[in-house]
């Protein structure tokens, strides 16, 4: 499993904090950020890498998280969540099988961002009754 991470200019500093944290937790992290990229391009780059392997997960950081979330949900087969707390990050993996989260650097601080990332990457899909919902989401794209 690789964690694919990216950020626009507004999210770059927090992205580096999250990236360093995940590397310290022994996760393979692939940073697709390119200087000056808009959140749309960053989100598309993260999603492309996430979709290369079923077990890959993605994190996109900009100022508020909403823009990358809107982009991610337009991509076929991508289930994404905009999160600003640890519980939602963990639960979106368990119940929705989300493969990407977005967050805003002007919404969450460094400590919370680390905990969000940790909850997301350590979350496991529960399957079962939740698969019906995931199938519905996948039919929409």
Curated annotation (Swiss-Prot):
<keyword id="KW-0423">Lactose metabolism</keyword>
<dbReference type="GO" id="GO:0019512">
    <property type="term" value="P:lactose catabolic process via tagatose-6-phosphate"/>
</dbReference>
<dbReference type="GO" id="GO:0009052">
    <property type="term" value="P:pentose-phosphate shunt, non-oxidative branch"/>
</dbReference>
<dbReference type="InterPro" id="IPR003500">
    <property type="entry name" value="RpiB_LacA_LacB"/>
</dbReference>
<dbReference type="GO" id="GO:0019316">
    <property type="term" value="P:D-allose catabolic process"/>
</dbReference>
<dbReference type="GO" id="GO:0004751">
    <property type="term" value="F:ribose-5-phosphate isomerase activity"/>
</dbReference>
<dbReference type="Pfam" id="PF02502">
    <property type="entry name" value="LacAB_rpiB"/>
</dbReference>
<dbReference type="GO" id="GO:0050044">
    <property type="term" value="F:galactose-6-phosphate isomerase activity"/>
</dbReference>
<comment type="pathway">
    <text>Carbohydrate metabolism; D-galactose 6-phosphate degradation; D-tagatose 6-phosphate from D-galactose 6-phosphate: step 1/1.</text>
</comment>
<dbReference type="InterPro" id="IPR004783">
    <property type="entry name" value="LacA"/>
</dbReference>
<comment type="similarity">
    <text>Belongs to the LacAB/RpiB family.</text>
</comment>
<dbReference type="GO" id="GO:0019388">
    <property type="term" value="P:galactose catabolic process"/>
</dbReference>
<keyword id="KW-0413">Isomerase</keyword>
<dbReference type="InterPro" id="IPR036569">
    <property type="entry name" value="RpiB_LacA_LacB_sf"/>
</dbReference>
<comment type="subunit">
    <text>Heteromultimeric protein consisting of LacA and LacB.</text>
</comment>
<protein>
    <recommendedName>
        <fullName>Galactose-6-phosphate isomerase subunit LacA 1</fullName>
        <ecNumber>5.3.1.26</ecNumber>
    </recommendedName>
</protein>
């Amino acid at each position: 499993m690789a964690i694919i991470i990216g950020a626009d200019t507004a999210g770059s500093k927090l992205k580096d904090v999250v990236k360093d944290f995940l590397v310290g937790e022994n996760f393979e992290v692939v940073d697709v950020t390119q200087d000056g990229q808009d959140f749309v391009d960053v989100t598309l780059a993260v999603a492309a890498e996430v979709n290369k392997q079923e077990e890959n997960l993605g994190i996109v950081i900009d100022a508020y998280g909403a823009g990358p979330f809107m982009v991610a949900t337009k991509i076929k087969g991508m289930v994404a969540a905009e999160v600003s707390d640890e519980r939602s990050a963990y639960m979106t993996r368990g119940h929705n099988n989300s493969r990407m989260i977005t967050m805003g650097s002007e919404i969450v601080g460094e400590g919370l961002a680390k905990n969000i990332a940790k909850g997301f990457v350590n979350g496991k899909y529960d399957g079962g009754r939740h698969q019906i919902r995931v199938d519905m989401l996948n039919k929409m794209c």
